[in-house]
């Protein structure tokens, strides 16, 4: 028997032994149970409740798959993903390099999938006479350099600016800290939180001197399919990039102004995915990226990540 035949026999024997070992290996029921439990839920920042619920409604009706949303603050949503308590989290940030490398070192393949853009909306009580603000003044409010309405608008008599967020650990707070304050935390005593986005709207509606910050997907009037009408019980401020805000240089978080970059408080919504089996979490993240999922985002008043935008000029006849 020549050397080549011996080599072929050795390779064949190795393959057979490998197959026998694979066939004889037993599945790990605890590992399977842990995967299925984590695959049964997704986590999302509470501010995404309206859009995620709508996406899930169409996804479950189309696929008959089931996945339960857990709406919490962004920080805890990511923590659950890192602890393998879920394989999917919706946030307004990518994985940090530490998070990514930690998962890779554990033989995972984490992916951050941009799915949409939304605007961070600044809302005030309907009795507030002022309707626009500069980015510079907004930052000064968050830094505590401005605490009274008349420091921005001399004729405004509403007194202290009562700033209200949804949750101290929410995506809204984190985005403002990172993008507006350069990583510095809020210190002003007139800045607080009321747990949820719905509670922010309710608070602003009842307090004339308040200023609320929420995701724009909470604002759209569901009766208006054109997404150009905001809720009537509060006012949405226009935001200007210039040093002086006027109605002509300030923009509200409408889809077109998110699209063309006029609205400055735009943020990306990510699906953070760590599903190793392409199970239901992967299917749902993929669904949100598909034309149908993107159309749902468009209809909800947000800016889709991948869908084509048709922009039409409207001529108003004043006769």
Predicted segments — roles?
Residues 75-106, 222-224:
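Pocket-flanking alpha-helical
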Residues 95, 110-115, 120:
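Short, glycine-/small- and polar/acidic-enriched structural segments
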Residues 1-21:
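Sec-dependent bacterial lipoprotein signal peptides
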Residues 23-82, 113-116, 124-319:
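Exported/periplasmic ABC-transporter solute-binding proteins
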Residues 98, 107-110, 129-132:
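Peptidyl-prolyl cis-trans isomerase
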């Amino acid at each position: 028997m020549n050397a080549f035949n011996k080599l072929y026999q050795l390779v064949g024997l190795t393959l057979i032994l490998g197959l026998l070992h694979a066939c004889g290996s037993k599945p790990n029921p605890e590992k399977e149970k842990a995967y299925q439990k984590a695959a049964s839920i997704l986590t999302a920042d509470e501010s995404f409740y309206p859009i995620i619920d709508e996406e899930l409604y169409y996804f479950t009706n189309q696929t008959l798959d089931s996945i339960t949303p857990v709406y919490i603050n962004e920080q805890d949503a990511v923590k659950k993903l890192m602890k393998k308590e879920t394989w999917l989290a919706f946030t307004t940030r990518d994985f940090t390099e530490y998070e990514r490398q930690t998962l890779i070192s554990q033989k995972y393949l984490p992916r951050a999938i941009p799915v949409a853009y939304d605007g961070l909306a600044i809302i005030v009580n309907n009795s507030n006479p002022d309707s626009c603000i500069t980015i510079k003044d907004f930052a000064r409010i968050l830094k505590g350099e401005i605490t009274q309405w008349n420091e921005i608008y001399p004729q405004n008599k509403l007194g202290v600016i009562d700033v209200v967020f949804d949750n101290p650990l929410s995506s809204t707070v984190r985005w403002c800290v990172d993008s507006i304050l350069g990583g510095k935390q809020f210190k002003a005593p007139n800045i607080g939180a009321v747990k949820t986005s719905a509670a922010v709207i309710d608070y602003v509606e009842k307090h004339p001197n308040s200023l609320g910050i929420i995701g724009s997907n909470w604002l759209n009037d569901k009766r208006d399919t054109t997404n150009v009408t905001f809720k009537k019980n509060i006012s949405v401020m226009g935001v200007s990039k210039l040093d002086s805000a006027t109605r002509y240089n300030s923009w509200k978080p409408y889809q077109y102004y998110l699209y063309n970059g006029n609205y400055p408080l735009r943020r990306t919504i990510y699906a953070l995915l760590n599903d190793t089996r392409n199970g239901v979490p992967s299917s749902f993240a993929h669904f949100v990226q598909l034309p149908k999922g993107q159309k749902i985002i468009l209809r909800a008043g947000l800016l889709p990540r991948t869908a084509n935008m048709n922009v039409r000029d409207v001529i108003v006849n004043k006769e």
